[in-house]
Regions:
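Hydrophobic transmembrane alpha-helices of multi-pass solute/ion transporters
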Residues: 1-11, 15, 181-184, 198-251, ...
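Membrane-embedded helical hairpins/re-entrant loop segments and their flanking transmembrane helices
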Residues: 9-10, 16-19, 43-79, 249-324
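Hydrophobic, membrane-embedded alpha-helices of multi-pass small-molecule transporters
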Residues: 19-35, 167-179, 196, 212, ...
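Membrane helical hairpin/interfacial module
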Residues: 51-60, 69-128, 136
Length: 470
């Protein structure tokens, strides 16, 4: 039986009042909209018309909304029962673009369906892989998911689009004001203001961006071209194609997305249980199955692949509102907004400093949560090496990606994502260090983790020197 954390205002099964539900849903929808620029870029790159752009964006929103709703379900092993919203998956963008270049939108749709079906298979076998994911490695997954948000959040905060571009002072000022409002409302605002911290920050940020010209003519031009109400264009929606040469790449991206979703769901578990010790793989399996349905549905209806949103999960932690009913509200609202292009357009053109401020704000919670999970069961010398080596090589991939430019063949996919690399290194090192040499009967000394579990798991782990004597 889980124990409710003290700082939680609305727990996973609480049902907020309708006005609260609506405002919390709007907060999550605004964050879910942050990646709607991806289908715009994809369709434009292959020479698609404005109608096609609008149609793919709308269908992507519908797919994400459906995914958010089914994730909040918990029916006979399907769904996680958590507030874990979906957005247009950045993980899938590169390979979806490749598919669109090679075979247009029909090929992108067909390969997206393949990725969704593969994740369904992965969801069914994850329970058999429990031995590979002890708490310290699941914490690492959460930490690396958060780390993946850092480059995007900081670049948006500083107003940098290209590597050599100078920092924009105006952008930083607006972002700093936006995040300051969020922090003040969260730390000193009390329960009610904390619920709406991000919404208050967004309103402040949009206003300042408008005054300073960061929300300018090009944004209004895009909004002016969009109708108020329109059915999504379904031209060619039933056309699907398939290419064997793209299967390996889509499967790798599918696994990476599943690992990210696993980290998000673990974060959901921890936020909702003060006595959390280890992931519930039955629940995670149900969540991954729901995620696979979201990806498959997105491909079937003609949108881009969706993925669970780390920033939305962190938002629920920051506001203290993790009710799955907020997931129903946000998902339904996102589906409805797919039929109102002008309103969804306002959300999809979020000013750079506002997006940066939100990402910096919510990522802070996820980074700390990942560290807490890693340390919660105590650290010994084996865990230190497994986690330390994984983080070192993962960060090297992000900081100096050219180090691995010469790697090709079947190893190459492992070096496409720091999350994937960190997970593989941690799992392999952990299993190697746990292996016993043949003929040596050795019972390891009781670890700090075991002792703490016997005391009820109330202490948060810290590095203990006695562990190094093993």
């Amino acid at each position: 039986m889980s124990r409710r954390p003290e700082g939680l205002i609305y727990g996973v099964n609480d049902r907020p009042r309708l006005p609260v539900l609506g405002l919390m849903g709007v907060q999550h929808v605004m964050l879910m909209s942050s990646t709607l620029v991806l289908p715009v870029v994809l369709v434009a790159e292959i020479g698609g018309s404005f109608e096609q752009v609008r149609g793919v964006v709308a269908l992507t929103m519908i797919g994400c909304g459906v995914g958010t709703i089914v994730q909040a379900l918990r029916v006979r092993g399907f769904g996680s029962g958590f507030l874990c919203p979906n957005l247009c998956g950045p993980n899938f963008f590169g390979i979806s673009m490749t598919a669109a270049w090679l075979g247009g939108l029909p090929l992108m749709r067909g390969m997206t369906i393949v990725a969704g079906l593969f994740e369904a298979v992965f969801a069914k076998v994850i329970k058999r892989l429990a031995f590979l994911f002890p708490p310290e490695i699941t914490g690492l997954v959460v930490l690396m998911v958060a780390e993946g948000l850092v480059p995007l959040g900081t670049s948006k905060f500083l107003g940098i689009t290209y590597p050599d571009e100078p920092i924009s002072g105006t952008n930083v000022a607006v972002a700093a004001a936006t995040v300051s409002i969020m922090v003040v409302a969260t730390v000193w605002g009390g329960g009610k203001l904390r619920l709406y911290a991000v919404l208050m920050g967004m309103v402040t940020g949009y206003t300042l961006a408008l005054v300073t010209g960061l929300f300018g003519a090009e944004h209004f031009e895009r909004l002016a071209r969009s109708p108020w109400v329109a059915l999504p264009s379904i031209d060619g929606m039933t056309q699907l194609s398939f290419r064997w040469s793209l299967v390996p790449a889509f499967l790798i991206v599918s696994v990476t997305g599943a690992l990210k979703s696993m980290g998000n769901l673990i974060m959901c578990e921890k936020v909702n249980d003060a006595d959390w010790k280890a992931p519930d793989l039955n629940r995670i399996s149900g969540g991954l199955l729901a995620d696979s349905v979201a990806v498959t549905v997105s491909g079937l209806i003609g949108g881009m692949a969706s993925d669970t949103s780390a920033s939305n999960v962190a938002l629920s932690s920051a506001t203290g509102a993790t009710s799955r009913y907020i997931g129903y509200a946000a998902g339904a609202l996102f589906v409805v907004l797919g039929f109102f292009p002008k309103i969804s357009g306002v959300l999809s053109v979020m000013p750079m400093p506002v997006m940066g401020a939100i990402l910096v704000f919510v990522t802070s919670f996820m980074i700390v949560s990942g560290i807490q999970i890693i340390l919660a069961s105590g650290m010994d010398i084996r865990k230190t090496f497994a986690i330390g080596l994984a983080v070192i090589f993962a960060l090297s991939l992000d900081v100096v990606p050219s180090l691995y430019a010469g790697i090709s063949g079947w190893l190459r996919p492992m070096f496409e994502s720091s999350l994937t690399l960190a997970t593989v290194v941690a799992v392999v090192v952990n299993q190697l260090l746990r292996a016993r040499r043949p003929g040596v009967a050795r019972t390891p000394a009781k670890t700090v983790a075991a002792a703490r579990r016997e005391r009820g798991g109330k202490e948060m782990g810290a590095l203990d020197r006695k562990a190094y004597q093993q």
